């Protein structure tokens, strides 16, 4: 659980959400331990604060929105999203079963390293066909740290040519939430792709 004093202090003094006393930003955080209370880690972004007897904030690392407005919960989320995890030996049947889910709008595709996948012709054709049907496919890395750089290797460039969009250094969790949010607000596939290439609340790093 949370330390009530520490949590209250953190809540009142910073504009960005933090996890527990580790002070890690929510948008870059993944759960990495099933047994430990200290279960969340942020590998692509440094801690925003260190909490002990006192709280020390790393102010330059904290995301500051352009304007400060009261919290507005967003309930319009489109759940027609799926995760496609690429693995060695993946079969056409597995990919086809996911890309042909009725009503599917977006896919978070977990790839190798800096955004690579097997260069199977059938895989590229299936991805291209899905994109042409209006499905937005976002490429995120399976690695805990690092970023998708689809221009780096030929396999990544082929994914770009098929219409796959870079997820940069987004976590899978954040990419899923972002797709749900964007489609939930009635955006077209092209509008969703445009918003995937920019940071809405500091959730991705674009050089």
Residue spans for each PLM region:
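Short beta-strand/turn micro-motifs composed of small residues
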Residues: 1, 19-20, 141
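A generic, well-ordered mixed alpha/beta core segment in the N-terminal half of proteins
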Residues: 1-2, 8
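Short helix-loop capping/hinge motifs at secondary-structure junctions, enriched
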Residues: 4-5, 186
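Short, active-site-adjacent cap segments at secondary-structure transitions
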Residues: 5, 23-25, 144-147
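Polar helix-capping/helix-linker motif
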Residues: 6-7, 101, 120, 129
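N-terminal targeting leaders only when they are immediately followed by extended low-complexity/repeat-rich tracts
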Residues: 10-18, 186, 190
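Accessory alpha-helical/coil subdomains and C-terminal extensions
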Residues: 13-114, 119-120, 198-207
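C-terminal non-catalytic interaction/assembly regions of soluble proteins
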Residues: 111-207
């Amino acid at each position: 659980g949370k330390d009530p004093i520490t949590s209250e202090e953190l809540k009142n003094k910073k504009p960005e959400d933090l996890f527990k006393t580790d002070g890690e930003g929510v948008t870059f955080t993944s759960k990495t331990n099933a047994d430990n209370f200290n279960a969340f880690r942020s590998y692509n972004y440094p801690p925003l604060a260190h909490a002990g007897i006192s709280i020390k904030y790393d102010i330059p690392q904290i995301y500051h929105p352009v304007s400060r407005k009261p919290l507005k919960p967003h309930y319009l989320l489109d759940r027609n999203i799926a995760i496609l995890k690429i693995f060695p030996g993946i079969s056409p049947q597995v990919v086809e079963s996911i890309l042909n889910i009725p009503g599917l709008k977006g896919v978070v595709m977990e790839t190798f390293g800096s955004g690579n996948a097997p260069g199977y012709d059938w895989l590229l054709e299936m991805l291209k066909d899905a994109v042409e049907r209006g499905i937005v496919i976002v490429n995120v890395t399976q690695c805990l740290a690092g970023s998708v750089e689809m221009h780096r290797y030929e396999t990544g460039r082929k994914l770009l040519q098929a219409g796959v969009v870079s997820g940069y250094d987004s976590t899978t969790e954040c990419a899923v939430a972002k797709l749900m949010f964007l489609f939930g607000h009635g955006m077209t596939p092209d509008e969703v792709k445009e918003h995937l290439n920019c940071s809405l609340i500091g959730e991705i790093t674009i050089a």
